[in-house]
Amino acid sequence: EYGHKPILLIGGATGMIGDPSGKSKERNLLSESDISHNVEKIKNQVSKFLDFKKQKNPALILNNHDWIGKLNIIDFFRDYGKTLTVNYMMSKESVKKRISLGQSDGMSFTEFTYQLFQAYDFYHLMKNYDCKIQMGGSDQWGNITSGIELIRKKTGQKSFAITCPLITKSDGSKFGKTEDGNVWLDRNKTSPYKFYQYWLNSSDEDSESYIKIFTMADKKFIDSLILEHKSKPHERILQKFIASELTKMVHSEEDLESVIKASEIFFGKSTFSDLEEIKEDVFLDIFEDVPSVKISKNERSEEHTSELQSPV
């Protein structure tokens, strides 16, 4: 909207190596088929947030397997491996932290080379797409600045890094696809109902942070909503706004209406017609954690017949 061309880079190649940043042990390596599957899923998910089809300045989605997969290892180490020294690479926090763990839980050569491949990504994007700014989470600072250094040494040009803090909860734990208690954009992994409930059950402290990070509301509105919430926290005004906005953004208006009705059913605030209209998958989500027993249809039918035949 402001003239920049966003490029979403998917790590089809680097995903096979595993980024050591922020990890105390080596990641489990994914197979090529698993990564291809994930790439397609990610493309579908981000299409809700970035427009790849608009005529003016469309976003671009790229997979680094398209260029890294074609590299000859000897040529790569000769042309790019000589550019970054081992001293420079070992100065990165992610490397120092892993090496300090000792020999048993140290860093493999595979993981050590990760930053060189990510640096090459930045160089490739600048050379072929005039990309001069790379954005990412704060744990990617070392990898991104390695790219800046590679670009400087290979071309003499300036490039830039922008990172944002990793999102953490009030208890210090972080969001992440490999963390416990995570929430997914894919409705098959986190249903719209559970997605809505996740935000609805957020703490007051977390919600004050989430509304600033995840919604497009302006500062004046956010400040007034926080004040209103603090005056009657039992109504969970802040949580309801965040849950509604994010469910609409990630899923749809229809899904939002459905999960709100589902919540009303659970707390006995609905009509019989609401119960008839609700989708089966949403209904099952509501009562997933509610104590229940299963009765077969045949067993219930036999019981009913027995009641009819009983003498008055």
Name these PLM-found stretches.
Residues G22-N28, F77-D79, T85-V86, Q140, ...:
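Generic alpha-helical propensity signal that fires on short helical segments
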Residues K154-S306, S310:
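Conserved nucleotide- and phosphate/pyrophosphate-binding catalytic cores
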Residues H37, K56-N57, D139, I167, ...:
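Generic structural microfeature
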Residues E1-S138, I148, T155-F160, S173:
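NTP-dependent nucleotidyl-transfer catalytic core
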Residues G142-I144:
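Short glycine/serine/threonine-rich phosphate/pyrophosphate-binding segments
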